Regions:
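Active-site loop immediately N-terminal to the catalytic Tyr-X3-Lys motif
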Residues: 28-34, 56-57, 96, 114
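Conserved SDR Rossmann-fold cofactor-binding beta-strand/turn motif
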Residues: 60-70, 112, 125-127
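Alpha-helical segment proximal to the catalytic Tyr-Lys
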Residues: 8, 52-56, 117
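Active-site loop-to-helix junction immediately N-terminal to the catalytic Tyr of the SDR YXXXK motif
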Residues: 29-37, 49, 77
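Residue(s) in the substrate-gating loop at a strand-loop-helix junction
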Residues: 23
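A glycine/serine/threonine-rich, flexible loop-to-helix segment
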Residues: 56, 68-93
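Active-site helix of classical SDR
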Residues: 3, 39, 47
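C-terminal substrate-recognition "lid" of short-chain dehydrogenase/reductases
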Residues: 1, 97-126, 131
Length: 132
């Protein structure tokens, strides 16, 4: 919905960046999270479609797919928030830690910068290796 309002401005200026946030669940689904997984998969595909449609206007569209972080949503992935459940989940992340807001922010800054001017339609997984 936000893109609907920004795209005309971006088209007029022949440049712009749209950055969406999905999740590793969109590329590597977790059990018992059907609707969550599906919504993140939709976001990834919708972003790729937007990237194809908007590239001729100089507009780039990318997605960040973070792994679970220390947020209220973490409990949805863990079930019961215990040291054992955290350890079990962390064992699926090769780098051995949850994402931090700074991890996502750094990826976002890069994708929105001129250093990423040739990147569109990409999914940047900020996930410590979870989807390997």
């Amino acid at each position: 919905l936000t893109a609907k309002h920004f795209v005309p401005y971006f088209k007029k200026n022949k440049s712009g960046v749209i950055l969406n946030i999905a999740s590793t669940a969109g590329v590597s689904p977790r059990p018992n999270l059907n609707w969550y997984n599906s919504s993140k998969g939709w976001m990834i595909l919708a972003s790729k479609t937007m990237a194809v449609e908007l590239a001729p206007f100089g507009i780039r569209v990318n997605v960040i797919n973070p792994v679970a972080g220390e947020t209220p949503l973490l409990k949805s992935f863990l079930g019961e928030d215990t040291p054992e459940m955290r350890g079990k989940f962390l064992s699926t992340i090769p780098l051995g830690r949850f994402s931090m807001p700074e991890d996502i922010a750094s990826a976002a800054l890069f994708l929105c910068s001129d250093s990423a001017s040739m990147i569109t339609g990409a999914n940047l997984e900020v996930e410590g290796g979870r989807t390997i």
